[in-house]
Amino acid sequence: MIVIRNWQRISYLSFCRFSTRSLSIQQFQKTPLLLVVRQQGSARLKMTSSPPEIVPQQPLDALLLNKTDTEQEIFLTKYPNYDGRDILIAILDTGVDPSLPGMQVTTTGERKMFDVIDCSGAGDVDTSITRTVKDGVIEGISGRKLAIPEKWKCPTGQYHVGLKPIFELYTKGVKSRVISERKEDVVGPSHNIAASEALKQLTEHEKVVGGTSEKTSDKWAREDFACKVDFLKSMASVADVGPVADVVTWHDGEMWRVCIDTSFRGRLGLGNVLGTFRETGDYAYLTNKDSVVYTVRVSPDGNLTEIVVPSGAHGSHVAGIAAANYPDNPQKNGLAPGAKILSLNIGDHRLGAMETGQAMTRAFNMCAELNVDIINMSFGEGTHLPDVGRVIEEARRLINRRGVIYVCSAGNQGPALSTVGAPGGTTTGVIGIGAYLTSESADTLYGVYKPVESSIYPWSSRGPCQDGKLGVSLVAPAAAFAGVPQYCRQSMQMMNGTSMSSPNAAGNVACMLSGLKQNNLKWTPYTVRMALENTAYMLPHIESFSQGQGMIKIATAYEKLSEILVNKVFPPRLTHFEINVSNHCKKSKGVYVREPNWNGPQEFTIGVEPIFQNHLSDNNLPAISFEKQIILQSTAPWVSHPQTMFVVAQERTMVVTVDASKAPKGANYTEIVGIDTADPSLGPIFRIPVTVINPEKVAVDQYTSRLVGKSGVTERRFVEVPSWATSAKITLRSTNKDEMDRFTLHTVYIEDDKCSRNTETQKIQGPIGNEWSKSITVQGGKTLEACVVRAWSRGKNPVDVDMTIDFFGVKKPTSISLIHGATNTPIRFQAAPTKSIDVSPSISLKSLVVSLKPQSAKVEPLGPRDMFLTSGLQINRLLLTYQLKVQKPSEVQLQLAGLTPYLYESPVDCVLFQIFGANKSFVGASSSYPDRWTQKLEKGDYTIQAQIRYPDDQVLQGMKELPLLVHVKLGNKISVDLAASASDATLGKECKFAGKALLPNQEMTVYAMNIADDKLPKTIVPTSGSFLAGTFSALKDSDLSDVDKSEVIYFLSEYSTRPTKGLSMVTTKKDTNQNQEMTDAIRDLEVSWVQKLTDEKAAKEFFEACLQKYPDHLPLLQNRVKQLMQAKLVDQTPENVQKIIELCGQILQITKPNETLQFSSVKQEHDDDLLTVDKWLALTGGSEDQRKDVVKLISQFEERKKSIILALQALSSLEQDIEVRKSKFDVPASLRFGGITPLIFGGKQGEVINKKSEGYEALKSKSEQIDATVSEELKKLDSNWTGNQFYVKLLVWLSADDTKTALISAKHAAALGQFGRCAKLLNKAGDELKSSATDSQAVDTSLAEVCESLEWNHLATHFKNSALIKNRTSYRLF
């Protein structure tokens, strides 16, 4: 039984939408319905045996994708074979999943997917290292032994190996889901069991031993149990780094093959062997759990393997709209089911699937190489500079030289005007598609039951482009259900946007081209576009800015285009008519009069030039013979122009006058169209767009207007902003709105060469309340557009909305510069002439900007995929490397001034950053629009690489000194104190300006004070050129002050070293002797070189020579001990360890540990030298005459203490190496054989081995020799030595978990089999090493082995993967 309340209208289709299961029509008709009929406030029940008989007019599948409004159904009914066959569509998007049902075959049975390519580089794997098989295995980059199946063929015997973290191939959503499922299904249960067992062991020990004991072993055991509990608790929230796969690439004699070790254990026979997709069509899934499909490509030399995965669901959905083919259910087909698809992924995984210049230009090159017919690109961004930039240059070359039809989304930034994006709405030759809402789809696609009128979606971007082009070319249906990648875990998904209208249009065009190709008719982008625009249906009551030339009508367009091509109306190499508009110094592509100061007659010089494709031919006859007699027409009385034009193959100019004062208020659009007198039925052969915005004036400081809120209909108001205004508050009031009504408020004003996203404000108002307000920034003298649109789904009954715009103004500097150290800096501001304002001036600094110089810069040519076919250009790159030291966890953004604000309009191909940790671990990426890419950096050292791509290597050479600006978000904003006068500011007298007001036109000056040094940020040490950035606001109103701001730059000098106490502190007077200072400097230089020499023989000889001159100099002895202790076990010798122990003994003899320990108890952290001298004299019973000697002695104690600790570190480390090697417990091999010992002394890690490693037995034998020597020498040093004495002595000076002691303590714990304590200490040491430039792989490997010993296998796996991810053999490729 089904209960339905408020029965008004129900159909089989809408019923199925609400039902939890799918019903056939017959089942639906037989289902009893319980209707609840509302009558006079009460409900009465009525049982019905069956619903009214409703027969759906079409199956539900037919409503998933609109093919009716564009005439596609009519077209294919008439021409069933013109379904896209023989046409190749390139989908420049997030990649297409080749496993989808609709992507398998065309209507002719051919493979649907021509190729699948990742142009971004995010899936690249360096496979330049080769291995040969030995005993049936090769060693992977991971260190795993990879078993080569016997059935693999490799005539060369060379296997290329690489490494890829699997999470780098996941989208953010997939990664989040996989982590959650792994935690719930695998990691979580295992971890909970381990934590429970650890707590049980601790509780049991507490019961048995109690709180006191005389045995040290009980102390260590208790600590071990407690450490297990603490360690497991800390690991419960650790980030899942995911598995790491070895990649093996080889040539089987016919083609390159690739196997990704998805067993993660070296069992390659369990993995999938794939050939390159273009040749084989092979694809596989990374794992069954994630369902992420991948394909592969390999460079000609095998040194680069591309793992191609979708970076989002968007691309598959778009491809499904354009050309999906379902042989068993044709109603689900895309628009061109017979077409083939070329998947070109331009959405970079590293950037959340945002496009990059690198990806787009590579994609254009592939389109040229593979002879693509149509591009669909459902991507785009706002642009500061329309129709320019390296990406745009390559796009236009592809259109003009290769004849590719380029269809692109216009953007989703509406409803305000001039919001079209690049490239769809701003690029000459690109067909920009707007978004059409069909009333028939509202029920099925959106679940909207109220009547809906077909219209343009409110969010669809509108023209005109800022350079005067109309922006939107055509519109097409913009919502559909289509297939999405299997990792989405659903077969289809509903999406809307111009991203969906563009492939709808592209699919329609593919059908048209399919017919032309089968009839051997040669088209050009120009003829295709002209036929589409001249036959499109202009939707009634919808402005041209929204719909361009109207709805695509493909059947009509095909007939028109066929006629043009058959009659050869245009030369085949005519690419387009170039329109150039000049007005004084401004160049544009159309006439766009918007600002109030243009309100009068304006003259424009307009050039019209036919452009021919001449780059591939010496035949100039088509251009020479080209002649057209043109009639010029327009319908607007405010435009005056010549009536005729004779066009030949050169630019022809004319003068056009536009009188904005004669145009109606609001937005006005017309076109000067060129009609061929020889054949007027063709329609316009070129169009000159003319837009005039005639704004309304404001009465004093307020504008009001009543809007009619029809669902989905945009109400626009254009207002001349008063010259003094800097901000405004817009208020909307509705008295008769529906309780669920929502309104979108969108405001825009235009600045020259600035994208509308920088000057727009958009907010959805409602549904709560009936009055809303929004404060915005405005610019005096500009035209402000304020448009309001009611949600399109609210039905046909309009509501009234009153809009009020109140203007406010405060005249102030647009930018304020302050200098650290300046005691007062005046800042002047003035109230508007029309009203008083309440003021509360303030300066808030929000970020530190640090300027970094490049440490290295290299210009080099890129590989084969960056040799561009259409332009013939070899793309080069400049690789800049910067070093960044972060002292506290920070959030940073990266900027190259003058380059990163741009993408499509960028003068270079691409700017891409990658951030790496100390050991080449990948941390994050950034590119254009730095404010979108915030990286969270922990304390440590980082390497930042910036890649700039450009064809001309000399241009890149000139950029080799570019500074990198690192924007560091301040944890707490810094407020700059303001004073009422210069003298108050200098004297530090801050003024609170609460309750202050300015009369109209009144001026006020405040004085910015200096920031105290202790308030400056310490996250990153500023360099020369660094500054603090923030804003200044004068207004008291919080909403207005948030938008009415001036930029503030506070320039810093480099930090000076500050004393720990006040400047008035009295310190001990030190004797100076210039000759002694010189002698000491020479000695220190020599001593520093002892540790720098890498040749052991030279180092030994130099040390002995220095020792003769400075026999008791502690830094000399320390440096030699460090140098010898940094040696790996494989390089260590009995003679060297003997020397280490000898030197440590010498150090302990010189330093007198007991005396030094006494001093440590006397010297407190904040004591000054004078007080310490008094304490020492009192403790030792010394006299005042000994003061000078004590002062000298005290100055030596810190160096003595440092030397003692180093000596005990070395002795205890050698001592514990013996203990772990003779331990009866299963101590990890990396601990047992000195893998971490060199790390203690600042060296590189030792061997990371296990019992199966080659050389294990030889290393074991050598360790026995070393241990024998160490044991003998330690007994000589301390006759009472039995095994742990030096470690216990070290604990006198440092705690067991001190960073200098942690690794030694870990060895001590491992020797006792106390792996809980060992794990906690290793984890702490690993965190410390990770933040420095020290390789921590040995520590992570040891941690993994310790966890295996404890049977914490989930953590063992984590640390193995972590070791590989944190310690890369090379930087991630760009």
Swiss-Prot record:
Domain Peptidase S8 residues, every copy: 62-558
Reaction equations catalysed: Release of an N-terminal tripeptide from a polypeptide
EC class: hydrolase
GO molecular function annotation: aminopeptidase activity; serine-type endopeptidase activity; tripeptidyl-peptidase activity
Enzyme Commission code: 3.4.14.10
Entry's Gene Ontology cellular component terms: cytosol
Catalytic residues in the record: D93 (charge relay system), H314 (charge relay system), S499 (charge relay system)
Keyword terms, alphabetized: Aminopeptidase, Hydrolase, Protease, Serine protease
Disruption phenotype: RNAi-mediated knockdown causes reduced fat storage but does not affect feeding behavior.
Database matches in InterPro entries: Peptidase_S8/S53_dom, Peptidase_S8/S53_dom_sf, Peptidase_S8_His-AS, Peptidase_S8_Ser-AS, Peptidase_S8_subtilisin-like, Peptidase_S8_subtilisin-rel, TPP_II_domain, TPPII_C_art
Expression tissues: Expressed in intestinal fat-storing cells and some head neurons.
Domain of life where this protein originates: Eukaryota
GO biological process, alphabetically ordered: positive regulation of lipid storage; proteolysis
Function: Component of the proteolytic cascade acting downstream of the 26S proteasome in the ubiquitin-proteasome pathway. Has a role in regulation of fat storage.
Family affiliation: Belongs to the peptidase S8 family.
Protein name: Tripeptidyl-peptidase 2
Organism: Caenorhabditis elegans
Gene: tpp-2
